[in-house]
Amino acid sequence: MNFVLSFVYKVKARYKHRTPTFRPELEEQGIELSVRHLKQFFKFGHGRSAFTTKAVHDVSFDIKKGECFGLVGESGCGKTTTGRSLIRLYNITSGSVYFEGRRTSAGSRWNEKEIKWTKIRGRKRIKELKKLQASEIDKLMDTTGLVPEVEKINLELSQIEQELVDIKVVRKDRIAQAANIADEEAKTLKIEEINKEASLEIESRRVRLEELNAKLKEYRQKIKESKKEKPTPETEAKINEVKEKYASEIKAMKDHIDQVEKEQIEAIAQIKYDNKHVDKKLMSKMQMIFQDPVDSLDPRMTVEDIIQEGLHIQGQYNHFKNSQKIKDVLTKVGLLPEYASRYPHEFSGGQRQRIGIARALVMNPRFLICDEPISALDVSIRAQIINLLNDLKEEMGLTIMFIAHDLSVVKYFCDRIAVMYYGEIVELASSDELFAHPLHPYTHALLSAIPKPDPISEKKRTRYVYIPARDHDYSKEAPKLVEIVPGHWVLANSVELAKYNEQLKK
């Protein structure tokens, strides 16, 4: 908190004479919504018991105009959080959201962290440079020739200290294995033997440590005494050269830290400005249909009041015009205009969801976020809602982001599908490509869970269970979201990419 406050005054100084961020290239490319490095974290608790949940971590994707984009994953993977972050129901932690080329939401956590870690890395590097400078000067001033010997002793000391740590780890592992011996007497003897062997190894290394430390102390004393002698003019000139060389490197590092801080403070100021000066009329063109039709409708309000609430927020209070809009939108979603005077509890689940759709459509949106709108409905009603959304998409030219946990639902409805797992997109491709050539193990797991309407094949079907520890080895190289073929992205490292390329060739 103190770190953020330290540069607040600088942010305020750069706050004036700004305009909202606009990226015309997104409009030229026909991109309705662009998400870049979206992160949504939630903090819980206080003090030592505080922890952070990374609900969405570094998610990026584009949705083109008129497209239906599917976001699929199991419960808790961050689908709904992503949708709510896009429509500003949450203040996003980091990243940017662009709607029709304009930045509608952004977070500054990454920028603040960049300043912090640049300073930490910079200070660490400056300390290293000063240490190297002192080492070179010591070598120049040393008349005893013992500086290289001191360096060798220091290296051996660090190796012995690491060996001591390794011995203790090995002893612990061997004792854990010996604990499985059934015979108590044999187990006790084995543990005593392990402890004795480890103690002997530790003692031998401690003796060597004492010898080296004594020798190191002696050498350092001799070097210290030799430094008291005045250096020759030639040596003094070399020392000045070393000081100048490292002084220029240290200055360059300090300049780099200042430059990064200046750039990130400027970026933070722009983010704060964009978040404060969001175009409300533009945001009204982005609407959301919620998952639960019961909880999303206020039971104390009539259907008319529920639908026209958004109009009132936008300052549209003309009763006649609003009533006409409500009748039109109720007709669009397949409900009678007379239902406007009723309350939500008087309707079935499917009808309530249609009211939720009507509430979103009355604002005449261009982008619609559908957060699992059919998961709480009967199977027969689901098809009706899907068909309704499809008709509205064609009639009104809507761009839709459809959130679901079942791949079979979005197979024929969505143009492209992104698969999410624990806050990250693990695979993104067109609907046909994803079902024809699934690559990521988690996608295979979701596809294997889809039941088939064939009793014979259903009996033979084997369910694939995704276990990250078994399916991936990221100990040496972390994964990245890579475009393996045009339009098909997968989260993988270089080893997995080679394997996936072989799969695609077959």
Q: What spans do the regions from the language model cover?
A:
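A short, surface-exposed alpha-helical micro-motif characterized by mixed small hydrophobic
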Residues: 410-412
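Conserved ABC ATPase "signature" region
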Residues: 321-338, 447
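Conserved ABC ATPase signature
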Residues: 343-347, 351
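Hydrophobic anchor residue at the start of the ABC signature
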Residues: 357, 385
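Short catalytic/signature loops enriched in Gly
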Residues: 1-33, 43-47, 52, 109, ...
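Conserved catalytic motifs of ABC-family nucleotide-binding domains
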Residues: 364
